[in-house]
């Protein structure tokens, strides 16, 4: 469609290096249930590429960075061909680091229940997917990240984390000492206004952003559980769509990612429908 780019969906069906299980089952479930068709309904072309690693047996850390590199190449290729990359990933770090590298380091607007700001020195779980933002701003795994084509750390001030509400003590200390802007859950109706203010400040620094949607940003009670880590006090669908519209009104979106969807927790399909609405809001300008 003239004026609106075609979309390249980049599916990365892995959770901690393991294919097609837990959150790794999310990308294909979204595709099997009409995500691409919904995006095509506006008349734009939508192509689908699935990324697979060759590491056997998978090692979580090494595989994570291998997948990031594969995503980076796909994102770069899509942009070079005039397409909008939309990464569907089991894990956040794969979509985020790969997209940031492939898009040559735009700003970050990241929707997530969790801070993703631990490092190997602060984590109590060893879960690399709790370190995605820390990797993005150059706080950890620096040598491994150098191997991702196109990656350079993002300045902390160029990152906005939205609706974060499940943060470790060590993560909070790290946020307090950083330039990352953190917008918490909606309090007395001020959440969207606070996000709007944060986006306005970010707009004074960057024009191009990567938008990341971890589906556990959604309210576990009002919408449904996206995964085992889902929590209350999240966004409802209307808030999510309004927030994504705010982003599209202010920035050019270089790439977008949707992550952390475990279909086994979505027993009534409400998260699936919310994810589809989010994908449309991420990729379709309001004028479409």
Regions inferred by a protein language model and the residue ranges of each:
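Conserved alpha-helical scaffold segments that buttress catalytic/binding sites
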Residues: 2-288
């Amino acid at each position: 469609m003239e004026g609106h780019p075609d979309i390249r969906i980049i599916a990365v069906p892995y959770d901690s290096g393991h294919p097609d299980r837990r959150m790794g089952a999310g990308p294909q479930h979204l595709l099997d249930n009409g995500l691409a068709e919904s995006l095509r309904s506006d008349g734009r072309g939508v192509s689908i590429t699935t990324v697979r690693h060759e590491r056997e047996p998978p090692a979580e850390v090494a595989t994570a960075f291998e997948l990031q590199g594969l995503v980076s190449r796909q994102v770069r290729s899509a942009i070079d061909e005039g397409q909008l990359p939309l990464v569907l990933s089991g894990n956040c770090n794969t979509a985020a680091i790969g997209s940031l590298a492939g898009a040559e380091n735009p700003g970050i607007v990241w929707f997530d229940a969790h801070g993703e700001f631990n490092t190997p020195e602060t984590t109590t779980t060893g879960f690399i997917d709790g370190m995605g933002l820390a990797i993005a701003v150059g706080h950890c795994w620096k040598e491994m990240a150098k191997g991702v084509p196109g990656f350079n750390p993002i300045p902390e001030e160029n990152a906005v984390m939205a609706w974060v509400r499940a943060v470790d003590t060590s993560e909070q200390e790290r946020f307090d000492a950083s330039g990352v802007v953190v917008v918490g859950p909606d309090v007395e109706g001020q959440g969207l206004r606070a996000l709007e203010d944060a986006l306005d400040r970010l707009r004074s620094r960057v024009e191009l952003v990567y938008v990341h949607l971890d589906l556990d940003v959604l309210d576990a009670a009002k919408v449904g559980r996206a995964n085992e880590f889902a929590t209350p006090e999240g966004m409802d669908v209307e808030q999510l769509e309004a927030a994504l519209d705010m982003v599209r009104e202010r920035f050019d979106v270089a790439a977008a990612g949707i992550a952390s969807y475990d279909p086994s927790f979505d027993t009534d399909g409400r998260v699936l429908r919310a994810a589809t609405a989010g994908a449309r809001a991420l990729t379709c300008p309001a004028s479409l």
